[in-house]
């Protein structure tokens, strides 16, 4: 049988567990209500509907206040950013000042004779001709008007051609500024804001350019010497020098004139070994042939023996001193 003490202990533990369970459930419901104020299902634990309505209204008011505060902060930040951008744009705007006293170099491809002639004594004035035509319309017919106009145009063309032919040759030399006086060296160049260079400044500039060019040539020469240093290039017996003639005597040069050699011929001449001299028969016997100037390297007898040396043309097995000795 279970004693009374154990029963009381179990009851106390159960009561404490129920109290803790209720406490934690209420804390959870409060946290959920703060996180999700729009979700009103968490208020189902409340018994009275009036309490739930009051809680809903309070949550709505708090959310409205928070949203209005956020909107006010955002609007203030946007206004500050716009003001800063406007200030920067106003500071960065270029302020241009126009000076009416500045004389700009506007050149005309005309000589002064042509310009004065066209302005004052033009040979073909349209206004005067039209006034003369329309003044007496009853007396002058259309045919006569056309004839007079054609005659005047022909005269004007002839005069223009005669005058232009004399001045076309001098157009390149007579480029005259329209708004400047004769002595333009005393004025500032309005397009760049710098005075025109004097003769002394031009000479200094030319000397500086020459000096810089000499320094450039020296630097370039040192660079080429460094790149083509003979100590870097390893020369052997078979090295081909492209800029050196492969012929050493005048006879070789005459051969070059008769028959030019290719790069392959030069390479073969450098790489190939010594050519064997043609063999001359000294005497023949029934068993062998003896040649002049025989030695062991061209198929003759080895000194002090009756053994043939390596011929150089046949394989190694033909030599008596090799595998088949």
UniProtKB/Swiss-Prot annotation:
Residues 36-51 have a biased composition (Polar residues). Residues 68-97 form a coiled coil. GO terms for cellular component: host cell membrane; membrane; virion component. Residues 30-95, 138-166 are annotated as: Disordered. It is a single-pass membrane protein. Keywords: Coiled coil, Glycoprotein, Host membrane, Membrane, Transmembrane, Transmembrane helix, Virion. Residues 55-73 have a biased composition (Basic residues). It comes from the Viruses. Residues 74-93 have a biased composition (Low complexity). It is found in: Host membrane; Virion. Glycans are attached at residues 27, 47-48, 145, 160, 222. The chain crosses the membrane at residues 4-24. Its main location: host cell. This is Uncharacterized protein L309.
């Amino acid at each position: 049988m279970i004693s009374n003490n154990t029963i009381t202990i179990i009851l106390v533990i159960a009561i404490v567990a129920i109290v803790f369970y209720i406490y934690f459930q209420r804390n959870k419901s409060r946290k959920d209500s703060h996180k999700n104020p729009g979700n009103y299902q968490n208020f189902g634990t409340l018994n009275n509907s009036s309490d739930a309505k009051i809680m809903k209204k309070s949550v709505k008011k708090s959310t409205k206040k928070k949203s209005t505060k956020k909107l006010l902060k955002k609007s203030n930040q946007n206004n500050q950013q716009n003001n800063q951008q406007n200030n920067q744009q106003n500071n960065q705007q270029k302020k241009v000042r126009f000076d009416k006293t500045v004389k700009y170099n506007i050149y005309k491809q005309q000589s002064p004779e042509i310009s004065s002639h066209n302005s004052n004594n033009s040979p073909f004035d349209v206004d005067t001709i039209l006034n003369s035509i329309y003044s007496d319309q009853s007396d002058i017919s259309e045919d006569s008007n056309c004839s007079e106009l054609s005659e005047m145009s022909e005269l004007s063309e002839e005069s223009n051609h005669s005058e232009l032919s004399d001045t076309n040759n001098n157009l390149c030399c007579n480029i005259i500024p329209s708004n400047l006086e004769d002595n333009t060296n005393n004025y500032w160049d309005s397009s760049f804001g710098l005075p025109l260079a004097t003769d002394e400044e031009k000479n200094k500039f030319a000397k500086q350019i020459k000096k810089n060019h000499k320094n450039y040539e020296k630097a370039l020469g040192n660079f080429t010497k460094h790149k083509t240093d003979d100590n870097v290039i390893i020369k052997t017996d078979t090295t081909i020098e492209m800029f050196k003639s492969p012929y050493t005597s005048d006879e070789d040069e005459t051969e070059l004139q008769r028959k030019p050699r290719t790069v392959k011929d030069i390479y073969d001449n450098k790489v190939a070994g010594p050519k064997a001299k043609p063999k001359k028969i000294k005497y023949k016997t029934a068993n062998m042939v003896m040649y002049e100037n025989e030695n062991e390297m061209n198929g003759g007898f080895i000194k002090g023996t009756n053994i043939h040396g390596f011929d150089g043309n046949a394989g190694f097995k033909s030599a008596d001193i090799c595998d088949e000795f």
